[in-house]
Amino acid sequence: MVDRRPHLGGNLYCEDVEGIHVHKYGAHIFHTSDKKVWDFVNSIVEFNRYTNSPVANYKGKLYNLPFNMNTFYQMWGVTTPAEAKAKIEEQKAEAIARMKADGVSEPRNLEEQAQTLIGKDIYEKLIKGYTEKQWGRKCTELPAFIIKRLPVRLVFDNNYFNDKYQGIPIGGYNVLIERLLDGADTRLGCDFFAHREELEALADKVVFTGAIDEY
């Protein structure tokens, strides 16, 4: 196993900060609906039952994500799927009408695309700012194809994932990685491409997990 970083685990690597396992490269939640997979990883290290339920803050008001009935209640005060669906359809129709008034039939940018999929309110409060920060450009300057669809759940469920099993290894991902690699020859701080010929000669098959366009 070769890693050009000075530690095991790649993007799963955790740092211990005052006894807290901090995901150095962003939060990672393990999730699967396959019981065999779940049983396998739990045979290596015990997982907790963490449920990812994000919350967005827009001008001091909190909204549950992903978009579900809790979100729609917080947004509009609606309490039934029928009310939420009617509100979304109403705003989608308004977005399409604005486009037609401009003489266009298809979304010209991400803003128009998002509003025809989910309506103005959710777009303005929960999509626009995040997207513009992520891309460093205004949504009106981004192509429509970036957003193909926006999942909407007409149930009161804040669970981000649909998978049956999810969690984080107790003790952090480092424990999982170290046990998976127990007995394996590892080289850290080693650039695969700087020693490619030598390393490829050591194995019948290479599994590359870096940036695909580097290989």
Label the model's feature ranges.
Residues 1-18:
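Glycine-rich FAD pyrophosphate-binding loop
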Residues 2-4, 32-33, 171, 188-190, ...:
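Short His-Asn-centered micro-motif
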Residues 9, 20-25, 189-215:
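Central helical "cap/lid" subdomain
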Residues 13-23, 30-86, 150-155:
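A conserved beta-strand/loop capping segment in the N-terminal third of enzymes
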Residues 24-28, 166-167:
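A short acidic, glycine-rich active-site loop
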Residues 37-41, 176-180, 209:
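PAPS/PAP-binding and catalytic site of the sulfotransferase fold
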Residues 56-61, 70-205:
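Active-site/ligand-binding neighborhood in enzyme catalytic cores
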